[in-house]
Amino acid sequence: MEQGMDYWLGQIQQKDVGKRLQVGPDLIEYLLDRQKSIDLEQDQTLLDRMVDGLATSWVNSSNYKVALLGMDILSALVTRLQDRFRTQIGTVLPSLMDRLGDAKDSVRDQDQNLLIKIMEQASNPQYMWERMFSGFKHKNFRTREGVCLCLIATLNVYGANSLTLSKIVPHICNLLGDPNSQVRDAAINCLVEIYRHVGERVRADLSKKGLPQSRLNVIFTKFDEVQKSGTMILSTTDKNFDDEDSVDGNRPSSASSSASSKAPQTARRGVSLGTGRRPGTSSAAPKTGGTAKEGAGALDEEDFIRAFEDAPTVQIYSSRDLEESLNKIREILSDDKHDWEQRISALKKIRSLLLAGAAEYDNFFQQLRLLDGAFKLSAKDLRSQVVREACITLGHLSSVLGNKFDHGAEAVMPTVFNLVPNSTKIMATSGVVTIRLIIRHTHVPRLIPIITSNCTSKSVAVRRRCYEFLDLLLQEWQTHSLERHVSVLAETIKKGIHDADSEARIVARKCYWGFHGHFSKEAEQLFHALESSYQKALQSHLKNSDSIVSLPQSDRSSSSSQESLNRPLSAKRSPTGSTVSRATSKSTTGSLQRSRSDIDVNAAATSKTKAASGASTAPFSSVAALPPGSYASLGRIRTRRQSSGSTTSTASTPADTRGRSRAKVVSQSQPGSRSSSPGKLLGSSYGGIATGPQRVPQMPSEKRSKIPRSQGCSRETSPSRTVLDRFGISQPGRIPSAMRVLSSSTDLEAAVADALLLGDSRNKMKPVRRRYEPYGMYSDDDANSDASSACSERSYSSKNGGIPHYLRQTEDVAEVLNHCASSNWSERKEGLVGLQNLLKSQRLLSRVELKRLCEIFTRMFADPHSKRVFSMFLETLVDFVIIHKDDLQDWLFILLTQLLKKMGADLLGSVQAKVQKALDVTRDSFPFDQQFNILMRFIVDQTQTPNLKVKVAILKYIESLARQMDPTDFVNSSETRLAVSRIITWTTEPKSSDVRKAAQVVLISLFELNTPEFTMLLGALPKTFQDGATKLLHNHLKNSSNSSMGSPSNTIGRTPSRHSSSRASPLTSPTNCSHGGLSPSMLDYDTENLNSDEIYSSLRGVTEAIEKFSFRSQVDLNEPVRRDGKKESEMGSCDAGMASPASDLRGGTDMVEGGRMALDNKTSLLNTQPPRAFTGPRGREYNPYAYSDSINSYDKTALKEAVFDDDMDQLRDVPIDHSDLVADLLKELSNHNERVEERKGALCELLKITREDNLAVWEEHFKTILLLLLETLGDKDHAIRALALRVLREILRNQPARFKNYAELTIMKTLEAHKDSHKEVVRAAEEAASTLAGSIHPEQCIKVLCPIIQTADYPINLAAIKMQTKVIERISKESLHQILPDIIPGLLQGYDNTESSVRKASVFCLVAVYSVIGEELKPYLAQLTGSKMKLLNLYIKRAQTTNSNSSSSSDVSTHS
């Protein structure tokens, strides 16, 4: 009877030793016979149980014969299952580790052999050893010894390349101190074996491990003995890193023969690259300078792009789901002890999430920043598979996110650069391709210093690569991205031109011409600074180069040259360091590429010249004789405009190269047709530009001969005929551009009909016409008229040449979307043209198409080609939103936030106008409440850090939204409250008056939109926010009332129209508000039925309501509350406390009469009890939690601000002209860096006023004074800076409580003043800092100072420590205890500072701490060395003797 798995499982589980020994050999025979054990692989559960039984019952048996037999059975299983046994390794490994410590030598040897066999057949050495680290800490000393012996055996079988030895060496070092001598000896032997395979790096590594010198001496002696014995076995990866032949895994000049010599010499099997193909065999056609040249394992950009989508499909259900996925990925990647396959899976999952739309979630970029460390760790991994996947993922992130990947790119770039000299091809080429992809897609100026710093590397290979990267950067990036680092680029290129390596010099000369295209003036200065031999080399490089990228790009468009259009992404460098001329090779192979000159004007120009340049035998012959000043002919061809504002259309391409194989039929113009075209005027005004050398290789003569020449009086004579004519560039022997390719009369008729229809539609709808043309290229009317020649070039072409064929097939949406998603900017632009045509034809997109288009548009917001693609994208976006607005609700958040962010970018004025138009259309297309909620969410999002321009854009948008919203759209939610509180803080933005004004206008607009709801919202905010908003609203209402009394005709109601197109100008600061008339935003305020008395009554209601919600935040708001008429008169003082002293305060008694309802009938909720509730019967309702941020020493001040005096006497004590004086002083102080003497006088006057206790002045002007003073600290004149600090110090003395909300800003600015070069300013800053330390609450002060002490440089850290010392002298012991963990690290860091003054200040501060808390400080000083501790004790004793009245734990809390 034939036994199956069930039978053998029963035999394995039996306990009888005799039967086990009898059954064992039969089981081995069964397992090795595939016919008998055919069911072995069919039932995984039975197999798992069988392996588990063998590991626990047999291998762990106390009978050594059974243990040996168990290992033999496992060995048979490994032989049978091979790779499939890997899943069982975790089951058997613990038992095998235990057996390494068996008392029997035969068991230990058999165990070791089995482990080696598993490494070879079922797994690989690294996989196994990552799971065997626990053996180094095993409780059995024989096991610890056995693990070391097993490592020696592994090295002898597989070599050092198979293991990440850096992870194993620390475990071995720990065993050097093992209590057992056998283990210690085994550990030393292990290190010696590693030294045999790795070499001197082990010696250097051990020196850093902190081992005792005596032990190191023993080990190093053994190393020397091995070296002398001649038994060293060095692997290829361990050669000197400066060896040119082994450094660069991707050298362009390395021959294929050298690649074979560097093949890995490990015995282990090759591991698949993870993409289901072998390297070097993925493409049937050989690549130019491709894999054969790079060597086995090399990768290129094509491999990367294919691998981008080689990731499992995942779905993202929510932002929470995304966050959890990224957290798991970070956890795996941050720990290199995880299985390498898990780490590869984690890296692939990042790509999966990207493909699933992770970038659309708000929290993605915050989580991505947290992955920087994990990416760096993965890129440094010793396993090439992990490095490869890490590099692919980084490249994918860069290509998808573009400039949004700036932080990640900057973080990982140095690590990726370290891969370039790696001798392992797959690692070196992965690093190179990653850097190229990052340079192509992430145009961040901060990357430039990283690249240029590597241009001075000791490694020749790295220098060569860096200059190639620099060349690519100069081709791909726009000029504005490079401007910040012009000098660095120039200096780097200069070093490259002088480089010792000839190939590096060649590439550096190429970089020079790229640099010249961006910064011709600086390039010419660099040229003059070079020796004559180098100047000649530069000129001869330009003359002789076959490269089509050796010249600067037209308008920095890399894609406008043939180099970018025909280049596959994996374009390799030729041995000379230049790119192989692609146009020529393409023509010979017959694979025709689409010309892009129908999109870009400069590409059209080059295509024309390409055909014409064949007549000149030496196109660069005149360059060498040119002086540097004449290089303008080599630079960019710029589009110049006529005074009429129109520019001419571009010519179509020389030949249609869309891959059609049929014969080309060229349509010719008739003689005399349109020879007097109005476009002729354009060319005549642009003379004098000589034909510059072109970047396009000459077209073969057989190609040119197929293009018929225009004869006689044809339009060849028309100056508008070609782009070159229009720009006044002369050319020898021009030929006309080829017409569109038409294969039949049917095609011709269709093309004519389309051309006429397009022309007709453009004449009827002028605005629409622009959407078919690239930004900034508007044709003359003649070009688009119905009367144009049917066969003319312009009849077939839109502004940029031939209409792409899919424009006539509007149904082909997929092709349009594919073009829009292309990585080539010109294809993206072509796609946008097609999309505009689709939208114009009212072709509605399906839900799937909409989703994909939204994803594409999300990426386009970061498109780097602002002149070319982004501008057209904005035009298309407007049409898209108008047509599909009902289906875009889910995409509104991205749309709105991205447009607002773009308003903060440095864009051309015309592009910014298009962004504004897109915002206007968005505002009118979607529900207002939804937009408002999105904006509130965006404002409070902690991951967003909008710059000042973006803040202004957000605020202006909210203001315009509030004008059109219904009152019910404004909802008092927690998100809205947070957003409003942030807007209130923006009203004091120190860096921008625009932000301050815009924030004030928004608060007023929201107040006017829904007064009751906004009042309730304010009541729920902390008191500081309430005060700021209430004061602003009070001033607004007061000014509105004064203005409306002066010009009653201006008092109009709110505009009810939802689509109002009028936009209000920003409101000026309340203190500077004109009283003569209403600002546009004030006009909307509903004052139609209110006279002056009613407005004051309204104000009382508002302020009273705010006070109510402050003191009764826990009481049900709907509970009817009686108004106490006796206390109503107190509200009159609100006006006195908040209004401008210069305001007209007539009718003070009228204000307190009548007890009117607030604003309108909807505000009945605002009838509340007076603000002094906590002194009356309702005191029990006071909620201390709402005032938890108050500090005891400021309770009086807070009370004074919250409760106003009974009458207006306080204000009447202040002369009205006094406030005018302050306003004049502030106006004078705002003249920064001008009128020095006048401002000195103003500061002196302000110094006098600060010494007067004038509450009303400070109530109104404090913020403005403080901001102006802090701004004045950056003045050019040192005397003014010093004077500003003295005024600040005086205010600190007299008004300390007011600095509570500005402590951090004031402290930072004061400390920064210590860096001043003038002693007078530094002295004033020291005095101000000293006063600050005594004026601001100690705990608040220390919280600000601690991070400064830890991060700032000298002398700021010194000033901060001194200031902290003064603060500590006045803090209580209990409070100091709580913040001690924050204080001590910075002081210990200062104790180690290189500046002696910082060390001394740190010691004094520690002494001050000791004087407060005494011996309790000692535990925090454990890391101090003995000498430092002695010094500290010396100072402590000296302080105690100096102040004999104070004990070691004296309490100075009374000062606080």
Swiss-Prot record:
GO terms for biological process: cell division; establishment of mitotic spindle localization; microtubule anchoring; microtubule nucleation; microtubule organizing center organization; mitotic spindle assembly; regulation of microtubule polymerization or depolymerization; regulation of supramolecular fiber organization. It comes from the Eukaryota. Keywords: Cell cycle, Cell division, Centromere, Chromosome, Cytoplasm, Cytoskeleton, Golgi apparatus, Kinetochore, Microtubule, Mitosis, Repeat. It is found in: Cytoplasm, Cytoskeleton; Cytoplasm, Cytoskeleton, Microtubule organizing center, Centrosome; Chromosome, Centromere, Kinetochore; Cytoplasm, Cytoskeleton, Spindle. Residues 237-296, 547-728, 776-796, 1037-1080, 1121-1147 are annotated as: Disordered. HEAT repeats lie at residues 68-87, 88-124, 163-200, 442-479, 930-967, 1260-1297, 1378-1415. Residues 284-296, 550-569, 603-618, 642-656, 665-679, 785-796, 1038-1050 have a biased composition (Low complexity). Belongs to the CLASP family. This is CLIP-associating protein 1-B. It comes from Xenopus laevis (African clawed frog). The lineage of its organism: Eukaryota, Metazoa, Chordata, Craniata, Vertebrata.
